[in-house]
């Protein structure tokens, strides 16, 4: 078996080695030749450049903790907004909480009379003024009760103010007395007195003095 197959294998081997490779031809007949590639293959190595100065992260989380949320925005941190908020009665820490409550109550009571008079259920009757004034006074009473409940739930009697005693620059300041049980009680009492006074003053201007207002 081996003697008979060896001549065939040798003939096949010699045929493959001696036979010339067929060169492909184009459509017109001549052999195709390879064109030189217009691209130039270059190789380079990318290496990181070591800077002389150490880099640092420009935007960092609050206090270095990424899990702490910050509510500071360009609007809330602008000097104009800070000036406006610092002049509101609730944020004037140098003013007594009682006087702050009176000022806030006067504004609320005075402004609540008009909507109740013109949009109340008795707006088309002759009792619109009296009903609207009483409704505004009732809302002031309800708001005063809500402020009282908030003070009882948030502050403990006899404990000092929970407001911070340091500014952002580290300067010591007097804690806001409004953030205490006694200060909040004064604020609530002032709000009730100011609110009722504001309602009374608005009713007096519209219906007692009988001034030529746009609506009554």
UniProtKB/Swiss-Prot annotation:
Similarity remark: Belongs to the PsaL family.
Primary location class: plastid
Membrane topology according to the record: Multi-pass membrane protein
Compartment annotation: Plastid, Chloroplast thylakoid membrane
GO cellular component, one term: photosystem I reaction center
InterPro entries in the record: PSI_PsaL, PSI_PsaL_sf, PSI_suXI
Transit peptide: 1-47
Lumenal side: 156-188
Natural source organism: Spinacia oleracea
Protein's recorded name: Photosystem I reaction center subunit XI, chloroplastic
